[in-house]
Amino acid sequence: MINTIIFDFGNIFINLNDTYTLDYIKHFESSEHYKSIIKTNIQFEKGEISIDSFLKSYQSYFPDLSKEEIKSKWNSILGEFPKYRLDFLKDLKENSNYKLILLSNTNELHISWIKDNIAFYKDFKSCFNEFYLSHEIKLRKPDVDVFNFVLNKNNLTAEACLFIDDNKDNIISADYLNINTWHLNPKTDDVIDLFKN
C-alpha cells in the first residue's frame, strides 16, 4: 500500500516556460562548448560549484553576456506557480496520512528567484515532511543513488512510494527500483488530478 508520495517541483507545482527551451537552444546549444555547458549545469545542480563559478563558466563561453544577463536567461525557465496547487497540497497534508516528500533537481539561483518571487514559498515548503533539493543533498535525478538516498533516509520501501515527475528519464530510474510512478505530462495533466487517475 502506498504511504508516501514523492513529488518533483518543476512542471508539477511551478510551471516551466517552453520559450526558455527555445531561448536556451538559440544561445547555448549551437555553441561548440555545449557539452561543457551541460557538465557545468549538472555540477551546479549537484552543488559542486558556487554561483560565482557557474556564472564565470558561462562568461568564459559567452564573453558578450554579463553575469546579470546570464542569470536572467537561466531563471527565465521559471514560470507561474498557480495557487490552486498549493491549496491541493495543503489539503493533502491536512486530510490524508501520506508522507509527503519533495525531490527536485534545482540550484541556488532558481531557489533564490523562487523565494523572491513566490510569496507562499514557505507555506509550500512546510507542507512536506522532507524537502530535498539536489544542490543541497549533492545528488541529482535520474541517478539511482538519489532515490536510494530518499528511501534509506526515510526507512521507506519502494513499493510503498509513489513518485511524480514530468521527466521520462527520472521515471525510468524510479521504475527500475520498483517505485510506483506517474509520468505527468504538463500539457495534459495536473497534479491536482492525482486521485482521479
Regions found by a protein language model. Give the residues of each.
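Asp-based, Mg2+/Mn2+-dependent phosphohydrolase catalytic module
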Residues: 1-2, 115-197
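Generic structural signal for small/hydrophobic residues in well-ordered secondary structure
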Residues: 8-11, 47, 92, 102, ...
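Alpha-helical elements of Rossmann-like donor-binding domains used by nucleotide-donor carbohydrate transfer enzymes
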Residues: 20-23, 39, 53, 57, ...
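Generic enzyme active-site microenvironment
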Residues: 6, 103, 163-164
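Metal-dependent phosphoesterase signature
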Residues: 44-87
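Substrate-recognition element of Asp-dependent hydrolases with the DxDx(T/V) motif
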Residues: 69-117
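Active-site neighborhood of HAD-like aspartate-dependent phosphohydrolases
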Residues: 1-37, 46, 60-64, 176, ...
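Short, solvent-exposed loop/turn segments at secondary-structure junctions
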Residues: 12-13, 18-20, 106-110, 137-139, ...
